[in-house]
């Protein structure tokens, strides 16, 4: 069985949830390896829609084991709400098939308060568009070696001592710098334990579970969140998330050897979207952009914010290919492009008198590039009922083939609608 990484190749919201859901049919274990509840995966099954922020999309398939790896930052309240919501809809979310790494760090109430206080404190121009869910401050504490880990929820004395130590610094920031009220040790401890205690049965050694799966010849899928260009190191810094979103982090964020990863599927939306602030060379503020936004229902699953829309950017995607080494591409939302008379693909950038095949590496460089476009004919056909490659109009097939040529990676899956069965497989 293969061990496959699913990662977003753009700025997130590429449709990873649907692809994970589809490929979960062939895989026994699904692992979330980074990020927190600042990302949302939407999966539509029949007339039911599921939005998942922490729990892997594979939970919707009976008998699959779903793991939350050490690279994730976990909000206990959000996790438990997802558990209850899925249970109410008849999904088995017991600890025999849903497990959390003891090494995963916990988002504490003071992390969320600090996230909001900092963003409010900044002037409008310096804000990065954080979701305010405490992701960044939690990762900060992890790197500072003062964080609370999921395993600490089983040790109330240790948990309380960590809260006491953390609030010495956090309360100084709240009161002296941000003009907020100090937080109480007792209040924070009680809030966390009210839910945290319920998570204890879900705690496990994720590395060991994966190792056992391999011993039984089971395949494992590693589910990423956000997208490549939100990566803390390789994204459009500082307009990025607080974790490594690239495929290579699947190993570190799950506690497994990188040599076991043998397939990387890059999820690419047929156009480009971005939520929040940050450079976006192909952004559109015209009829075509409005078409993508309205037909594609481009609102964030986590924040509800309207997504910015633009033409497909293959210069940006070349960087994703270089960083992730994908074996194949799953192209999503191709149906949204129906009705556009012509399509444009950014094939390079003009920057400081040079033509670049990849984004400039200096900070703010991407904000000053000029996209170089190729124009292709569009199509009017409704492709949502397409079942085979031949069912697609010639213009759509040509669009896909040009993407393959520009990136040097085959497109193996094509999504033509939100439903599970609205997917073409080109294997």
UniProtKB/Swiss-Prot annotation:
- Give the pathway annotation: Purine metabolism; AMP biosynthesis via de novo pathway; AMP from IMP: step 1/2
For this protein, the record's SUPFAM superfamilies field holds: P-loop containing nucleoside triphosphate hydrolases
Short name of any one Pfam family annotated for the protein: Adenylsucc_synt
Instruction: List the InterPro entries hit by this protein, alphabetically.
Output: Adenylosuccin_syn_GTP-bd, Adenylosuccin_syn_Lys_AS, Adenylosuccinate_synth_dom1, Adenylosuccinate_synth_dom2, Adenylosuccinate_synth_dom3, Adenylosuccinate_synthetase, P-loop_NTPase
Question: What's its catalytic activity?
Answer: IMP + L-aspartate + GTP = N(6)-(1,2-dicarboxyethyl)-AMP + GDP + phosphate + 2 H(+)
- GTP-binding: is it a keyword of this entry? yes
Q: What's the stated role of this polypeptide? A: Plays an important role in the de novo pathway of purine nucleotide biosynthesis. Catalyzes the first committed step in the biosynthesis of AMP from IMP.
Q: Which organism is it from?
A: Oleidesulfovibrio alaskensis (strain ATCC BAA-1058 / DSM 17464 / G20) (Desulfovibrio alaskensis)
If you read the UniProt record, what top EC class would you report for this enzyme, in one word?
ligase
The note describing how and how many cofactors are bound reads: Binds 1 Mg(2+) ion per subunit.
Picking any one GO biological process from the record gives: 'de novo' AMP biosynthetic process
Compartments (UniProt record): Cytoplasm
The UniProt entry's sequence similarity note says: Belongs to the adenylosuccinate synthetase family.
Keywords associated with the record: Cytoplasm, GTP-binding, Ligase, Magnesium, Metal-binding, Nucleotide-binding, Purine biosynthesis
Q: Which cofactor does it need?
A: Mg(2+)
Q: Where does IMP bind?
A: 13-16, 38-41, 131, 145, 226, 241, 305
* Name of this protein: Adenylosuccinate synthetase
Query: For this protein, what is the EC number?
Result: 6.3.4.4
According to the UniProt record, one GO cellular component term is:
cytoplasm
